[in-house]
């Protein structure tokens, strides 16, 4: 009865019955892992234990039917064949008696033929010379001394003694001096001791500030109102509670005074007055010029975080008036019939480039990353989810879900029942501990590939995801080689790359998951093949957790919303001057005197906190610059602390001490409900800032789309690119204008054309030349140019009226 009643209460999850797993794609991924490891004879990565013989029951995992892999043989060592002929004959007899089905017998015959030529057939796991295991060094001494692999290594040791791995060579180039050898470890020991002392001092300052606020600041009615604010269940309820707390503390008076040192209030007020005057007078030329001047990132400092850090909800009234007036004026331009469609198009394209775009960046952080579900839900409920989303490690899983589902689907999926699809850590200890000891990783790559397919909607590529939802997904990964550059996988750098393979690579933390091969769909035939020549990739958070620079390069992003849940970074979040939606607590006595600025914990405590934190960072930077830290597991771990982990807006969800116990465990539905709620409440204080920014961004995007549609209607013969980076303005070129410019009459032009036709008829062109010309024509079509003619509008500003040639360029991709 108990089981039946619980099953009846089970709430179904949208699309729960679909796992979207393509077994063929998983099989190709598994084969790529195996064969890539075998081919890496001179790899710079550590090695794995030897693979055992392949069980015939597992062949579906490595390539499907037996006959399909019969030609995939790897040449072995010829020297060992003669010595082991008798043993091979005995093994063959045993194998023939073991495999009786026709397919297995055919596979055995292939094995016999391969043995005669000194090769290892594809139906047997190869003895890996080296692979991407994170725990054991190259040519590990832990190998079995009686194995063929060890004998081969010893026999070839003399011939390879002079060769070293690229990583070791790079290290030796900078570590070969006598002074470095002599002073490295003493300096490193001193730094470790000194940083440890600084860490204890930093902890003491933080404890002092926390106790001061707990016992002296947040007491009585103030504490009751703050607790009420923290327990808000909806954003509307949160706004009401925040306004009540602001009124009690007297912070609402701060919003009425337009003067503030962190932005130019006079410029903002003057801009509002001029925009309103031009709009009311219906002076469209002046309105266009004014809008182009103010539609820029952080105009007059209105995007300064301090404007939102002095109240729990709200900012300066003047700032709110500015955003409202600008949006009204943009809509006025969109609806105006006095401006032709081409002028509108050029105007909105220009201001969109000046204003920039917004992006949501989700950090890594193991199971803490599930807090991003609540962050995304809060943005989705307010229709504020950006179209550009990046994710790293655990954050990549949430980013993939957001970019492969529509808004309607996400509203059905971002619920506690989603926990039933999160099974990455379901293996018990007696399963993953042997795997960790054997492979150097707690989790299995192929198993994770299957489990991630639901979140990526199967083997969806970056290009396909953008076509489905209009969102641009970005996953940060780094090569297994620590000296290779980071790649941000997206629809530009890797449009055909399969998303779930990048998720595995972005989660490949040493000891958790071994580096994996990225997979892609061949754009010609759709076959799944390794990406980037089969190189292996690992967790991007090791070097680039928040790829702000790359997002700016690819998508012109200059406003980032960062959800930061990395536990080793959250510990150092202090906000001495307050942060968005969380002002520094101060007494009512100060606010009554209209003194709204104060350092958290006082000036001395803030100064000490800054001193100790920056001192720790300085010594870590010295260690990295001098290359003093050993590269444990072939990784420079100093990058984990020295990255840029923040954005324009950074959300720091609160973590309890008990949460660290579940850092590598799957949440149940109750825990998932708490996690989503925690993420939503962390997002509420930031929504107003984001809403103001996106109100202008959405209005500009609306104008761009509207003007593009109008231009298509008026000039149907010109194809406009739908992508932001490939938009171009059509030309008003005509044959009559061309004749007037070159000074010829229609009769002269016809004579010139007749002469050219006669020359073409007499020309003797080879077939090879024709083919070359056809190929050149195709290339020219890909780079077709469109001239922009002057519209002779009296009000058009020079900034968006250039005589330029816009080129539709081919995207550079790596297949």
Swiss-Prot record:
UniProt cross-references to InterPro entries, sorted A to Z: Acyl_Trfase/lysoPLipase (IPR016035), NTE (IPR050301), PNPLA_dom (IPR002641), Triacylglycerol_lipase_N (IPR021771)
Motif, GXSXG: chain positions: 391-395
GO biological process: lipid catabolic process; triglyceride metabolic process
UniProt keyword terms in alphabetical order: Hydrolase, Lipid degradation, Lipid metabolism, Membrane, Transmembrane, Transmembrane helix
Biased composition (Acidic residues): 74-94, 759-799
Lipid bilayer topology: Single-pass membrane protein
TM ranges: 185-205
Enzyme Commission numbers on file: 3.1.1.-
Domain PNPLA per the UniProt entry, residue ranges: 360-552
Protein name per UniProt: Patatin-like phospholipase domain-containing protein LELG_00944
Species of provenance: Lodderomyces elongisporus (strain ATCC 11503 / CBS 2605 / JCM 1781 / NBRC 1676 / NRRL YB-4239) (Yeast)
Taxonomic classification: Eukaryota, Fungi, Dikarya, Ascomycota, Saccharomycotina
């Amino acid at each position: 009865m108990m089981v039946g009643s619980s099953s009846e209460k089970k709430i179904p999850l949208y699309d729960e019955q679909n796992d979207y797993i393509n077994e063929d794609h998983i099989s190709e991924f598994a084969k790529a892992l195996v064969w890539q490891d075998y081919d890496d004879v001179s790899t710079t990565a550590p090695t794995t234990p030897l693979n055992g013989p392949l069980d015939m029951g597992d062949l579906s995992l490595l390539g499907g039917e037996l006959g399909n892999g019969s030609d995939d043989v790897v040449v072995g060592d010829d020297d060992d064949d003669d010595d082991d002929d008798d043993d091979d004959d005995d093994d063959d007899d045993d194998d023939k008696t073991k495999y009786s089905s026709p397919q297995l017998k055919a596979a055995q015959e292939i094995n016999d033929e391969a043995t005669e030529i000194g090769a290892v057939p594809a139906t047997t796991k190869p003895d890996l010379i080296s692979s991407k295991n994170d725990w054991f060094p190259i040519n590990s001494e832990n190998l079995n001394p009686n194995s063929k692999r060890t004998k081969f290594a010893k026999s070839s040791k003399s011939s390879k003694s002079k060769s070293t791995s690229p990583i070791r060579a790079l290290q030796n180039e900078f570590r070969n001096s006598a002074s470095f050898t002599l002073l490295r470890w003493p300096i490193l020991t001193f730094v470790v001791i000194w940083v440890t002392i600084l860490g204890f001092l930093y902890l003491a300052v933080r404890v002092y500030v926390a106790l001061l606020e707990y016992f002296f600041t947040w007491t009585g009615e103030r504490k009751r109102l703050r607790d009420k604010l923290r327990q808000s269940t909806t954003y509307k309820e949160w706004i009401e509670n925040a306004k009540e707390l602001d009124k009690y503390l007297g912070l609402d008076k701060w919003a009425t005074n337009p003067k503030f040192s962190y932005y130019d209030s006079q410029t903002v007020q003057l801009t509002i007055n001029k925009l309103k005057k031009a709009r009311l007078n219906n002076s469209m030329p002046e309105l266009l010029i004014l809008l182009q001047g103010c539609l820029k990132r952080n105009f007059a400092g209105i995007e300064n975080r301090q404007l939102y850090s002095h109240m729990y909800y709200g900012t300066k009234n003047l700032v709110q008036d500015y955003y409202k007036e600008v949006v009204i004026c943009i809509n006025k331009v969109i609806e105006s019939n006095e401006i032709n469609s081409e002028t509108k198009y050029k105007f909105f394209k220009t201001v969109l480039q000046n204003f920039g775009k917004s992006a949501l960046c989700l950090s890594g952080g193991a199971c803490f990353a599930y807090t991003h579900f609540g962050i995304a839900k809060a943005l989705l409920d307010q229709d504020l989810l950006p179209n550009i989303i990046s994710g790293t490690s655990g954050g990549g899983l949430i980013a993939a879900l957001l970019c492969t589902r529509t808004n309607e689907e996400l509203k059905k999926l971002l619920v506690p029942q989603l926990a039933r699809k999160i099974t990455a850590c379901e293996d018990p200890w007696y399963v993953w501990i042997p795997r960790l000891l054997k492979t150097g990783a707690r989790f299995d790559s192929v198993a994770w590939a299957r489990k991630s397919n639901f979140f990526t909607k199967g083997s969806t590529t970056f290009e396909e995801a953008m076509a489905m939802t209009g969102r641009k997904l970005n996953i940060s990964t780094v090569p297994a080689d620590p000296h290779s550059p980071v790649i941000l996988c997206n629809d530009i750098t890797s449009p055909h790359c399969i998303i779930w393979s990048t998720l595995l690579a972005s989660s490949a933390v040493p000891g958790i998951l071994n580096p994996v091969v990225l997979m892609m769909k061949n754009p010609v035939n759709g076959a799944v093949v390794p990406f980037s020549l089969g190189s292996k990739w690992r967790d991007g958070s090791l070097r680039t957790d928040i790829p702000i620079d790359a997002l700016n390069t690819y998508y012109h992003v200059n406003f980032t919303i960062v959800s930061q849940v990395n536990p080793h970074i959250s510990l150092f979040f202090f906000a001495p001057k307050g942060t968005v939606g969380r002002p520094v607590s101060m007494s009512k006595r100060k606010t009554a005197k209209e003194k709204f600025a104060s350092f958290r914990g006082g000036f001395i405590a803030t100064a000490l906190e800054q001193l100790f934190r920056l001192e720790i960072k300085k010594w870590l930077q010295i260690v990295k610059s001098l290359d003093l830290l050993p590269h444990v597991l072939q990784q420079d771990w100093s990058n984990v602390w020295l990255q840029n982990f923040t954005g324009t807006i950074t959300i720091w969800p609160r973590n309890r001490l008990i949460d660290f116990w579940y850092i590598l465990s799957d949440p149940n539905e109750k825990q998932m409900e708490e996690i989503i709620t925690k993420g939503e409440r962390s997002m509420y204080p930031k929504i107003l800032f984001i809403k103001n920014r996106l109100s202008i961004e959405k209005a500009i995007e609306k104008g761009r789309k509207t003007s593009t549609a109008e231009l298509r209607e008026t000039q149907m013969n010109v194809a406009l690119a739908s992508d932001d980076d490939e938009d171009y303005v059509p030309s008003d070129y005509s044959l009559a204008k061309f004749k007037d410019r070159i000074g010829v009459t229609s009769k002269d032009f016809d004579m010139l054309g007749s002469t050219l036709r006669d020359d073409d008829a007499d020309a003797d062109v080879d077939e090879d030349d024709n083919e070359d010309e056809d190929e050149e024509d195709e290339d020219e079509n890909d780079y077709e140019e469109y001239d922009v003619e002057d519209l002779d509008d009296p009000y058009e500003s020079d900034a968006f009226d250039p005589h330029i040639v816009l080129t539709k360029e081919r995207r550079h991709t790596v297949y």
